Amino acid sequence: DTEMVFITCGMGGGTGTGAAPVIAGMAKEKGILTVGVVTIPFAFEGKVKIKKALQGVEEMRKNVDSLLVSNNERLCELYSNEIMRLEDGLAKADEVVTVAAKSISEIITMRGIINRDFCDVQTVMKDGGDAIMSVGYASGENRIGKAFVEALKSPLLNNVEIEKARRMLYIIYSSDEHQVAISELNEIRFFMNDLAEDIEVLWGVYRDNTLGEQVKVALIATDFADMNVTMNDKASQTTEQQKVMMDMYYGERKQK
């Protein structure tokens, strides 16, 4: 029996925007842990397409347990100082979605030193609402702390303040040759100090021998305190609600 399903689509068009929420709702009604992973348009694609995309996002939010939104506009910001071809930029957008789904799947399918399983993922993502899934890599001194910082640069964060998450799961990966030392775990303290006092945190340690001297941090955060933006009905959003969503996804980036 299927325990978990990922539903991915690009919002703003016809097929994905209309069909994905329906499919998601059918899966969730069957008790399947349902995770939506969607992309929303670049700002230059225009307000009509963006408005349609955000309405689709809201419909997805109503029909999934957790929703990851990858914003193409954030990719422009992150790579604004690089000479990147459009084709490569679009590939990056696809990569963000792929990495998110793959990282969640690996937590379930791989065996960790400090292990986490489907029940742990379910604890964090069941009825979790808006979600963050990000991955960061680092090596050298303070590598774990730096990996957390890199994870927080993810396009999946949008204008979300991770400090307001009430559920979190993170996994630290390292190779056999360059295992994480107990002393290195102190670096996590500085990250945790900024989180909500009532946050529920699960964590694990896994092996990945492709990393060499690097560590990888995979982070899932859900259940945000102030992100309950909902529509009054299935057809339309109020002007105020539209403004909140526009600011969340297309407003000025909040600096950490």
Cite the ranges covered by each PLM segment.
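Tubulin/FtsZ superfamily GTPase core signature
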Residues: D1-K256
